[in-house]
Amino acid sequence: KREQKYQCPNHKIFISPSTFEYETEQENLLWYDSADKNLYSEIKKVKRESRIARDNSEDALTWNVMRFLDRQGLLADFLSQLSNKKITESELILWSYSPKEKSDWTLLNQARVEFGETIARGSEPDIIIRTNKVLYFIEAKLTANNETTPSEVDNRKKYETGGNKLFQQIFKSDYETVAEKRYELMRFWLLGSWMAKQLKLDFEFYSLVMQSRELEIEATFGKHITETTKRKFSRLTWEQIYAFIKLLPDNKEKHIMTEYFENKTIGYNNSIGTIIKAFNV
């Protein structure tokens, strides 16, 4: 709780049983110059939930890593290596916010409506990257996992009927089977596939996790979906992104980023009083 009795008098952080929280969100963000500040404030207008001041915040991690790649003009190079395709143009859309449109992305809102969601409470991918060849969806996880279930079991929206019954074309399993454990991944696979089709782009969907987590996610979700050369689901690790950054020419921002990865923590083990290291780097 953000109460004075839980606040460290020296460091001003708030202590909880499993993690700590900075006094301000800015303290947990590596990039916060005027351009970043403006972008972040615009994102917050469309982003629904944020615990970005917490040490174990996947949103803060997502911002720090993806903004680094974007600021340095490295997204296209990273994605080219990831996909083995020549990516030359990219727009980074974090938590639905399109910098080009200066609002939540119109096409994403169209997809939400197409599949019976409301725009205000529709699916919100962490990371979308629109490029010249591929539409990327990246669902970022830090301490959470990809096991999700519907909050309203009987409200199937139009997931099975929208997009000219696209569900039947891109899933091997029925709605109940996928939604039982992989509801969030199901929605992103469905909406992303539809959006890529409108843009006439390939679709690549990545589950971004720590190297030590969810080793079987490609198999456990992959068995439910129909993949093609133009529509793929893959596991990606934060450590793979670190390895890409580590090989870059040295500069100040690269040094900040590699140190961040090497020292990142995800709270602490309260029973033995030790800090938990996030990454295997």
Where are these regions (language model features)?
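Charged, terminal alpha-helix-loop-beta segments
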Residues: K1-V281
